[in-house]
Amino acid sequence: MPGLLDRSTIFVREHVGMFKAANAYDLLDPATGAVVGLVQERVGGFFRKMLKFTQWKTRMAFHIEFHDLDGGRDEVVLTVSRPFTWFRSVVTVADGTGRVLGRFRQKLLSISPKMWVLDPAGHEVAFLKGDWKGWNFTFTDAGGAEMGTVTKKWAG
């Protein structure tokens, strides 16, 4: 069985709840519907949880873990984190051991989501552009060639 990061397509199912301070998602194999992974946001402390329900939510620091559940294991294979930010976000992506794989740096003053994808040394390697709704994203290389897409489709 392929590991979570070896898959080219994954379906994401959000854990639904009222007044959630932390987000969680199941990662599903599109062919079988089997749960192959879990994404869990870690929010520590009562004060931080309460801030998640205010206008500061979009500026707050976050730490998200991607767990590979394939084959009965529960292994953190990826983390995504961001410190508190005022204007331009820098999101760090690391492997399960904490080694930085790259970063996303937000473009300042943009109506639709736009970010540069940086390698561990901070060099721009790709560009991520979303539509105005933030549902569909396209990764392009330095020459403008499409490298991949992320699409959100409402299924409920």
Q: What are the residue ranges of the model-derived segments?
A:
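Intrinsically disordered, low-complexity proline/glycine-rich segments
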Residues: 1-156
